[in-house]
């Protein structure tokens, strides 16, 4: 009964799920899996990654647009989720290669020899062959999936508890989240971090146990999984922000002191939002990087979290669908401009190459939206709907 009431009060949620489902079905039918070959496997991967970026953008919108916390660290949680699943993918793939290479030996290899061979394959690039402690569960898919949830959640909980109980707010909190991201990135860049330093984790697109499956089929599976995760995340956060908790959270955004005066434990609400959005960001990262095929520390540098805030601002913060629109719009445009799809512009005295000028265009768009369309693309959409009704 409660579920029907929630959906009845929020028809936009049903519309979003319906559009997402139709989109997924159409892409699947037009992909190489069905033989239609109207959408290439590489573009299916691009769409799948875009859905993951939409999910982390929703998380950012909830923590910033609804709660008023401008976090410049949520892409760090996104990266942690990618590293967590990437460790299992790389270990399992390397284990298969090592076992196959040792199969022809006259004497069976001992577990220690197998472990050393796997370690040398993974960590030889940084001059080591020993497994760090953080790889203790890398051979167990279930435990690594738990790490996708627990590590971002625990880090966000500890950071949030320390920051919110100290009543750090505004730009100071944003600086702290950015410092956390920078510290994590600098740690991961070190060769002795246990995660291969600047080399990162590679070969993540090869799913162990499905070596014979085509990349087209795998890309569709990840597209569907990403769509399901996006739909579930959208419904969950729509439920959160549309209820009593959402009213309190929006009150904290607008006037934290007044909400505190009314007797609400502001820190608990902020900690819940910060932690749950971090977990969702980790899940999005765990789905994104197997489609990207590689993850390295540069992926979670502070600039990535700034891009995330730009996506939400362009789409329209304080609107879940606005975050989706902003992330999808910017990420697809980025793929087009930086992937060679956009033609260069010859001005005679200078050739504008979009691979170099894309970030300038993105920054200009952000300034224009901030000055003239503060509610973003989502706000323009709301205006059009109201005029037609």
Residue ranges of predicted features:
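Transmembrane alpha-helices and adjacent helix-loop boundaries
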Residues: 1-389
